């Protein structure tokens, strides 16, 4: 069982449930475009942690924990997979990728964002070589990005199961405090 298969088996439903809880705090309903924008924010946070040793310090939070930021990326990708109807029966095929971790998150994230904009009528439609439909491209990019994020955590010697669990607990508490 590879990293993506393990993550899907152990954490995918928890991620979807957590994102559903956040609906209580939303002023507007989130769709695939909104989730994609949040995914871009979280990928930026990974770059902040890895490339800027200072981190970002905001009132009440610091962006300096790679495990938490990777977990945030996985959370957004998990919810995006739910919104886009992605299934993971082929997760075993996503064990390696030609891109390095940061390169892959950036390039594939750009391709995913473009495809979601195209699907939603914000960009012109064009044929995608190697894919039967825009949905096939979206599904592929989500799975590849999840596998790359998990690989990044492994290379950093992180226990992403633990990190993801901590992030989910913290986020659940965040929602509970604000909806009490």
Residue ranges and their predicted role:
Residues 1-180:
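Flexible "arm" and connector segments at domain edges
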């Amino acid at each position: 069982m590879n990293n993506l298969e393990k993550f899907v088996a152990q954490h995918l439903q928890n991620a979807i449930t957590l994102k559903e809880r956040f609906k209580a705090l939303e002023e507007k309903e989130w769709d695939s475009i909104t989730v994609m924008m949040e995914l871009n924010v979280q990928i930026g946070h990974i770059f902040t942690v890895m490339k800027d040793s200072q981190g970002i310090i905001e009132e009440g939070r610091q962006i300096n924990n790679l495990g938490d930021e990777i977990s945030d990326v996985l959370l957004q990708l998990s919810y995006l997979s739910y919104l886009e109807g992605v299934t993971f029966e082929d997760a075993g095929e996503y064990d390696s990728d030609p891109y390095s971790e940061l390169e892959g998150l950036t390039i594939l994230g750009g391709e995913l964002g473009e495809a979601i904009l195209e699907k939603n009528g914000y960009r012109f439609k064009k044929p995608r070589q190697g894919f039967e439909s825009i949905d096939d491209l979206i599904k592929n990019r989500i799975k590849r990005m999840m596998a790359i994020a998990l690989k990044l955590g492994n290379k950093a010697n992180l226990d992403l199961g633990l990190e993801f669990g901590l992030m989910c607990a913290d986020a659940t508490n965040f929602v509970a405090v604000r909806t009490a």
